[in-house]
Amino acid sequence: MSVPHSSPSATPRFAAEVRTTGLLALPLVLGHVSTGLIGFVDNVIAGHHGTATLAAVTIGTSLLWLPMLVPIGTLISLTASVSQLVGAGREREIGPLFRQALWLSLGLGALMFGFLTAVPPLLPTFGIAPDIVPGATDFLHAVRWGGPALTFYFCMRYLSEGMHWTLPTMLLGFGGLLVLAPLGYVLTYGKFGFAEHGAQGLGMASAITMWVQAIAFALYLWRSRRFAHLELFTHLEGPRWRAIGELLRTGLPIGITVLMEGGLFIVTALLIGRLGSTEAAAHQIAINVSQLCFMIPMGVAEATTVRVGHAVGRGDPLGMRRAAWAGYAIVLGTQAVSASILLLGHDAIVGVYTNDAAVAALASVLLLFAATFQFPDGIQVLSAGALRGLKDTRVPMFLAMFSYWGLGMPLGAGLGLGLGWGPQGMWIGLILGLTAAAILMGLRFRQTSRRLTAGAAP
């Protein structure tokens, strides 16, 4: 969605900033919803094909996310770079920067391909059941071919978002869903003359969908008048290692930060899985609901990155802080709604997922824990987004490491496994880690933004 770069003079500046950020964030939130729906469709198709297929796709998807987090996080630095160039009136520099980001995305896509090729032979050593390994291997071997397309797609997406144009994220997200659902069904079950591929079919459908989305985005950028002046594809340009190195210096810490947070939740799920099927199922329900709630602050944080970066580029430190506070205001409101829904409706929500009384009872309790971390989760992701807009990424990386792996994971494992508190203990660790990250990231933005504001004072 396109939004104005400046606020109307007749409108109070803060209220206008809230509106601008909200309009910018809405397509991003809906884009994340489409991603969640793709995961839902994968599970439905696989689940109806068979328990073994569902288990294979679940394992394969979890392993797919690990190599995805670092490239996606690394490339998101392009959003802040582009937004700052737009704010500074230096849009001529965006085309060359984008072409170097494409080279970087090619390398990151190749690394994804290599990881997904190397992991399947190791599955038996991870304790994966022997009957699941073949299906998970087939899924990973198929989906790996979409790795380069995925990184190209996110490179183009972050360019577009940095230009204050977020509508393609939503449209291509739902477009991908429309491609994946029928294609996954046909290839998984073997319909319309195609062979039945099971879990491999979903991997093939996912890879094809990634390429369709990437090609569609490239055609849009090439043909759109909105981007014509950037001359994105007018000529070939070899890699310039200095420019790529600058992108990595800003982006790689973001990728590691995203991996630290994502890894916390992945390892927590694995540890809870050791406690039993009831505990694992209850945790999966609670974490799925939490992820749905998280889509809103994540989209607002991405919009805040753009707004903060634009203010930095135009040399407006007060506007930079106003953009961040607008993001905080939106997130505090949305998280209050999410927490209230979880507190008041946790039993009803669980009833949608399961009829198993033991699973429902535990999941209902875990949703109360999820309600508790709505505010710290929203604040930490918003603070991280604001810091990305400042291109302040190295210190936040260490703050994330300390919060999630120095505090959250040790405490969760100690309480959940060491003291026998079970999933509740692990979730206390999640709450502590997210709360520590929220406090430290918030203080970091406060410190950095105040320094920039003071430095700009006459």
From Swiss-Prot:
Q: How does it sit in the membrane?
A: Multi-pass membrane protein
GO cellular component terms given for this protein = membrane; plasma membrane
Where does the record locate the signal sequence feature?
none
An example GO biological process term is: response to antibiotic
- Membrane-crossing residues? 21-43, 58-80, 101-123, 143-160, 167-189, 199-221, 251-273, 288-310, 323-345, 360-382, 395-417, 421-443
Which InterPro entries does the entry link to?
A: MATE_fam, MATE_MdtK, MdtK-like
Localization per record: Cell inner membrane
Major place of residence: membrane
The alphabetized UniProt keywords are: Antiport, Cell inner membrane, Cell membrane, Ion transport, Membrane, Transmembrane, Transmembrane helix, Transport
Give this protein's Gene Ontology molecular function annotations.
antiporter activity; xenobiotic transmembrane transporter activity
Q: Which domain of life is it from?
A: Bacteria
This chain's function reads:
Multidrug efflux pump.
Which family, according to UniProt?
Answer: Belongs to the multi antimicrobial extrusion (MATE) (TC 2.A.66.1) family.
What name does UniProt use for this protein?
Probable multidrug resistance protein NorM
